[in-house]
Every structure is written in C-alpha cells, then in structure tokens.
C-alpha cells in the first residue's frame, strides 16, 4: 500500500485515524503497531515475520546491552552490540546483496552458483537503520532502553515512515512515543503537509517520470544531446518530488498522530556546492552515516589521508545502501570524490565565485549523478554520458517535440524546487484576515486533493522510487 493510492486515502487512512482518536490514550500505541503491521503486510505479507523478528531481536538486544552496561560488564555489552549489528546487517545483506555478490562471483570466476532470488522486503534498509541507531544509542548511554515491547514495536513499524523514511532516530521521538499530546493545530498542519506531499508526488513526480521513461526507453547510441538532457533533468525532478513528497506525507501523517519528525529535505537544488547539497538532501540518511559511521571512523579529527579514506568508505556504503547494483556504488563514490575535491581544493574558489556559478556548478554535477543512479548498466551509463555531450548531435525533431509538450511541466517543477511558491503564498496570506487565510488554505488543499484523486483514478503510473531501497 502506498500513500498515493485510493485505498490508503479513502480506506486505511480514515479508519486508522478515526479509531486512533477514539482509543484511550493507553491503547493508541497498540493500535498504531497493529495497523502499521497491517500496512506492511498489505504489500509484503510474506515478510511480516521478518519485521516481527527484527522488532523482537532489537528489543531484546537493547534490554541486554542496557543491563550489561548497568552491571559494568562493558566487554559483554560491546560483544552483544556487535552481535546485534551483525544480525541486522546480516539480514539486510542476505535479502538485498546476496544475489549481487553471487552474480559478481559467477561473472569473475565463471562459476554457476545459483542465485537465491529473494524478493527484497520493502523498507528493510530504513527500518534496519532505525533499529541499529536505537541499540547503538543504548550502548552509548544516549537513550534508555525501551522496556515496553509495544512502544518499541511502534517505533520500528510506525507506518508513516516505515517503508521510505525519513530514518527516525529513537532519541528524537523517545518522549513522543510515551507522552505525546495531539492538538487540533498540529492535526491541521499535518493535513496540509500531507496534501503538499501528495501533490508533489502525483501532480509533478509522476508526470515528469513519464518523460524520463520515454527518454530512457530510446536507444542510447542514437540519443541527441538535447533529448538526453531533457531526460536527465526530468529524472532529477522526478526523484526529488517523489522522495521529498513521500517525506512530506510521512511528516504530515506523523503530525496528525502527535509526532514531530525531523525534516528530510531543505531545497537541495538551491545548493551552492555538493557539500551543501548533502546537508539538504535526504538529511536523515546523511545524519545517520555521520553519527554512526563517519565519526566512529575518526571523522575530521584525524589527518587528511585518513579523512579521505573515511569519506570513501562512507560514500561507498551510502551508494550501496541505495541498491544492490554496482552503479549505486559508483554513484556513491562519484559523490565521495567530489566532496574530497571540494574539501581539499575547491572550497575557497567556490566561495569566491558568483552565486549563479555556484548553483550551476552544483546542478550540473547533481544531474550527472542522477544519470549514474538511474541506469544500472555501465554500458548504458557510458552511452548516455556520450549522448549528453553531443556524440549523436545536438538536437533533433524528437527533442523539440518532447520540449514543447513538456515545457510547462518542467517550468512548474523548476519553480517548485525553490522557496518562491511558499514565500509568495505567505506574503499573500499575511495581508488577509485570519478567517480568510484559513478559508484560502482549505480551498487550496481541497483543490490539490481533488486533482490528485482525478489523476490517480485515470493514471496507472504511480511508483515510489525509494521503495526499492
């Protein structure tokens, strides 16, 4: 089940919210846990046992680590932590990376080891990282172990962020899990945030995604530069509005349930460097890798050679986290190398450059990076890059057709990547009486919702890209 589906909007969502607010406060976490497991089982019934096992395993590990720390048995606590990390990474590796490893060995050694062909459990990368952050923080003493299995299960399985994030660290919601207070204002803000996210997904991401699919289906060996750039720009818009739209919906649903999740995006395409970009894009993932991998490796506290090694490790892992294909590793290393270059050589020159140059530099590298991300075959990546830089001509009739039929959509997408729409709306509303502000907001959200429903009824194209990870 996805948020941008009629089943969720008109069946699951009203049922969950209605019963949630009718439940006594003491039973609300239990209701959320049960409905979150139902939400997960709707699309992955076979892996509901894996989810339950993950909850139980990490719950017991957290209690065990805390008990051993309290008794000052630090070596045993560390051993249990290592076991917990190995168990989580082992499960993730089995389902996500086993066939990649087997296929690579077969290609190199000429062997014929049978692939496992295990279906990837939806959201396993997200909920595994949440569980790991919890147990590591218990070991560090940052948070207390959660003794209530229902509360812990709710943290891991909470449906708004279960299958595509944001990656919610336990320490950011520890108090909210037990003592949240829902308010009318918070619920209203949640509806607005959810509706904006739904609009991003259905009205923009799905539409520009169709343009990317059209271009990606063309032979890369005869693609004109203009068409190739149109496709790459379309995918750049698609993945942003797809993923940030999902994050908006997750944050909005959280608000309706009394939770305040941290932001996951901050206008990343306005960045003036790649370093800044990764502070604005998928913030929860970057924070996770910084706190649980980069800093433990030494971070910036060691010499430059070690810092470079740390960055290569972190960005290689970041790439592989996104998928079981070598293009994701290449994509991660691509950014790792750029970040190293910026850190060592480009930081000061970039700061002195005009703002427009900084932004064009960043956007160019971001768009090229998404080409590596989108195409799993190295040969296809090479052909597409050749097309981008004019190997098969500049523009052709197809370029002009795709441009003229999609120009309005692309301009809307570009504008929606900026702060201007929010600033313009706020400036307009600030001039009106409070009652008029409320009325206009309600009318706007209703219009967006109606348009989304109309598109969902008539359009079968509704993928969430990050569900693959």
Question: How should each PLM-predicted stretch be described?
Answer:
Residues 1-468:
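Membrane-embedded transmembrane alpha-helical bundles that form the catalytic cores
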């Amino acid at each position: 089940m996805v948020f941008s589906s009629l089943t969720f909007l008109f069946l699951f969502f009203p049922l969950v919210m209605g019963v949630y607010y009718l439940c006594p406060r003491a039973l609300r976490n239990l209701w959320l846990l049960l409905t979150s497991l139902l939400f997960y089982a709707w699309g992955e019934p076979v892996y509901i046992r894996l989810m339950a096992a993950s909850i139980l395993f990490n719950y017991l590990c957290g209690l065990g680590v805390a008990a051993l720390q309290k008794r000052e048995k630090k070596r045993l606590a560390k051993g249990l932590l290592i076991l917990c990390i190995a168990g989580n990474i082992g499960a993730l590796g089995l389902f996500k990376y086993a066939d990649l490893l087997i296929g690579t060995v077969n290609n190199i050694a000429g062997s014929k080891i049978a692939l496992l062909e295990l279906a990837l459990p939806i959201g396993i990368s997200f909920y595994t990282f949440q569980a790991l952050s919890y147990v590591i923080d218990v070991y560090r003493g940052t948070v207390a172990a959660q003794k209530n299995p229902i509360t812990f299960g709710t943290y891991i399985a909470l449906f708004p962020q279960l299958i595509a994030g944001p990656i919610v660290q336990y320490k950011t919601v520890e108090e909210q899990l037990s003592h949240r207070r829902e308010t009318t204002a918070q619920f209203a803000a949640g509806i607005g945030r959810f509706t904006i996210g739904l609009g991003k997904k259905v009205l923009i991401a799905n539409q520009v995604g169709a343009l990317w699919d059209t271009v990606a289906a063309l032979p890369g060996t005869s693609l004109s530069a203009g068409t190739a750039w149109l496709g790459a720009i379309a995918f750049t818009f698609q993945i942003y509005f797809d993923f940030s739209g999902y994050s908006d919906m997750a944050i909005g649903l959280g608000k309706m349930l009394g939770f305040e999740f941290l932001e996951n995006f901050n206008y990343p395409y306005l960045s003036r460097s790649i370093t800044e970009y990764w502070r604005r894009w998928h913030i929860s993932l970057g924070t996770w890798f910084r706190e649980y991998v980069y800093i433990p490796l030494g971070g910036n506290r060691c010499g430059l050679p070690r810092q470079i090694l740390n960055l290569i490790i972190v960005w290689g892992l970041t790439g592989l986290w996104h998928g079981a294909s070598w293009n994701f590793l290449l994509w991660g290393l691509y950014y790792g190398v750029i970040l190293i270059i910026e850190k060592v050589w480009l930081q000061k020159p970039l700061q002195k450059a005009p703002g427009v140059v900084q932004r064009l530099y960043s956007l160019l590298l971001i768009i090229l990076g998404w080409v590596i991300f989108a195409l799993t075959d190295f040969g296809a990546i090479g052909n597409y890059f050749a097309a981008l830089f004019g190997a098969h001509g500049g523009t052709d009739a197809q370029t002009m057709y795709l441009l003229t039929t999609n120009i309005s959509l692309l301009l809307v997408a570009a504008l929606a990547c900026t702060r201007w729409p929010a600033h313009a709306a706020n400036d307009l509303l600030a001039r009106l009486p409070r009652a008029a502000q409320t009325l206009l907001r309600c009318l706007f959200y209703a219009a967006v919702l109606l348009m989304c429903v109309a598109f969902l009824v008539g359009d079968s194209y509704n993928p969430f890209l990050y569900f693959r990870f």
